[in-house]
């Protein structure tokens, strides 16, 4: 017998086999889902169940006619940090650019200083408060980056917090090493030396402690060059660790081509990519991870080329980019709305972007992100007219029930 059977539900599966021009969500109406050992054992129309529900499962839950979706996947966040940067918001409103703030010691570096000055336990506590809000908004899988430590001790501190969050809270955590996020003051004007430090000192220790699921970098004129990022990617390849990259957010610096050449799981931001870059992403099978929260918050005017991604069949993901300086957001449904209104993505595209494609961007497409047989039962029950409503509300639309790893969780 199954452990659990859900009945009286409508399901938006995000299953490519069910998605069509007429139905971009992969819907099954009047559906049922059987769960065993935390995984989906059966899904389909309730009329096709092989026996009476009471003969199939130890527990039966009724969805009372509501909508079930996959748990949401937030595949790009900087949620592990201490400190506050709300005053920078006022500076930006007065015309100070992101680059200017960064160059005078604000931006990322101010968060680095705050993060360095708290203990691991304190960092866990402030991070857990944010993550609980994300969970309440429907996130069941969460990418968490380092990059606010920039020393051996403090990068490991962030990565240990990521692992601890995944143990303490009902969320699947993908931990990303982002040591190449900014240049710390200790290495002023010595970027190459700092990259060597990342490769020879920090990365081996993080790998030894099994703290890393992927490696990221910030390739931009205020951060690191393609040549410097390539050194990091070579080290990642040697260790068989997948890579991803912040690229083409503020200018076209060549990072996207580099990421495609190394088969990156995703390249993120992408406001300044051109068609040749998009073609490279298509050939590599790399996800274009779009971050409308940052676009909105820093009042960027150049949009990522969504039409080119469609033209070349590049999968488009969405994430909150939750961070203290450019995207203080914990709501993936709010991000879905921004993607529709700012980037002209369709509601159907945004749904796939925060489920199946978000999982693909983390290399977890065979684990989570869709409601199909064999997938982990990460599921959300919503009081909606239909899945299109998820991208309609400007955030604040929360699930009424939550299933993580097959277990019914209280909505936090």
Curated annotation (Swiss-Prot):
Main enzyme class: hydrolase
Binding-site positions, Fe(3+): 76, 78, 246, 321
Binding residues annotated for 4-imidazolone-5-propanoate, in chain numbering: 85, 148, 181, 249, 326
Pfam families: Amidohydro_1
Keywords: Cytoplasm, Histidine metabolism, Hydrolase, Iron, Metal-binding, Zinc
The reaction(s) this protein catalyses: 4-imidazolone-5-propanoate + H2O = N-formimidoyl-L-glutamate
Domain of life where this protein originates: Bacteria
One annotated GO molecular function: iron ion binding
Subcellular location field: Cytoplasm
UniProt GO cellular component terms: cytoplasm
Metabolic or biological pathway: Amino-acid degradation; L-histidine degradation into L-glutamate; N-formimidoyl-L-glutamate from L-histidine: step 3/3
Secreted found in the keyword field: no
Cofactor detail note: Binds 1 zinc or iron ion per subunit.
Binding-site residues, Zn(2+): 76, 78, 246, 321
Enzyme Commission number(s) from the entry: 3.5.2.7
Gene Ontology BP, a term: L-histidine catabolic process to glutamate and formate
Main location: cytoplasm
Positions that bind N-formimidoyl-L-glutamate: 148, 323, 325
Coiled coil: none
SUPFAM superfamilies found in the cross-reference section: Composite domain of metallo-dependent hydrolases, Metallo-dependent hydrolases
Cofactors that this protein relies on: Zn(2+); Fe(3+)
Free-text function comment from the UniProt entry: Catalyzes the hydrolytic cleavage of the carbon-nitrogen bond in imidazolone-5-propanoate to yield N-formimidoyl-L-glutamate. It is the third step in the universal histidine degradation pathway.
Family affiliation: Belongs to the metallo-dependent hydrolases superfamily. HutI family.
Protein name in UniProt: Imidazolonepropionase
Organism name: Gluconobacter oxydans (strain 621H)
């Amino acid at each position: 017998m199954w452990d659990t059977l859900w009945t009286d539900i409508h399901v938006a599966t995000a299953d490519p086999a069910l998605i069509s021009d007429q139905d971009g969500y992969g819907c099954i109406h009047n559906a049922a889902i059987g769960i065993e050992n935390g995984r989906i054992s059966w899904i389909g129309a309730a009329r096709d169940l092989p026996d009476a529900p009471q003969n199939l499962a130890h527990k039966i839950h009724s969805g009372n006619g509501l909508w079930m979706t996959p748990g949401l996947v937030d595949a790009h966040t900087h949620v592990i940090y201490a400190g506050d940067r709300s005053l920078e918001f006022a500076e930006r409103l007065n015309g100070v650019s992101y680059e200017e703030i960064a160059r005078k010691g604000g931006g990322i570096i101010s968060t680095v200083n705050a993060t360095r000055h708290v203990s691991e336990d304190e960092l866990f506590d402030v991070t857990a408060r944010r993550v609980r809000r994300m969970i309440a908004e429907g996130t069941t899988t969460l990418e968490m980056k380092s990059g606010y430590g920039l020393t051996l001790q403090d990068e490991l501190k962030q990565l240990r917090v990521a692992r601890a969050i995944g143990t303490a809270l009902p969320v699947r955590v993908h931990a990303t090493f982002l040591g190449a996020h900014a240049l710390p003051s200790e290495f002023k004007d010595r970027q190459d030396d700092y990259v060597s430090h990342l490769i020879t000192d920090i990365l081996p220790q993080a790998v030894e402690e099994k703290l890393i699921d992927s490696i990221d970098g910030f390739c931009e004129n205020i951060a690191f060059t393609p040549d410097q990022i390539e050194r990091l990617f070579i080290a990642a390849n040697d260790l068989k660790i997948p890579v991803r990259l912040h690229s083409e957010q503020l200018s076209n610096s060549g990072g996207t081509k580099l990421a495609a050449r190394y088969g990156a799981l995703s390249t993120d931001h992408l406001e300044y990519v051109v068609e040749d870059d998009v073609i490279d992403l298509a050939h590599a099978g790399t996800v274009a991870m779009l971050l409308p929260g940052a676009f909105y918050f820093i009042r960027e005017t150049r949009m990522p080329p969504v039409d080119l991604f469609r033209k070349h069949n590049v999968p488009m993901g969405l994430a909150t980019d939750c961070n203290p300086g450019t995207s203080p957001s914990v709501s993936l449904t709010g991000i879905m709305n921004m993607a529709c209104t700012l980037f002209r993505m369709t509601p159907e595209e945004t749904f796939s972007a925060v489920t199946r494609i978000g999982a693909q961007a983390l290399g977890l497409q065979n684990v989570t992100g869709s409601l199909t047989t064999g997938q982990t039962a990460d599921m959300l029950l919503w009081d909606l007219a239909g899945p299109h409503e998820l991208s309609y509300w400007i955030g604040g639309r929360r699930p009424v029930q939550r299933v993580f790893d097959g277990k019914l969780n209280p909505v936090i």
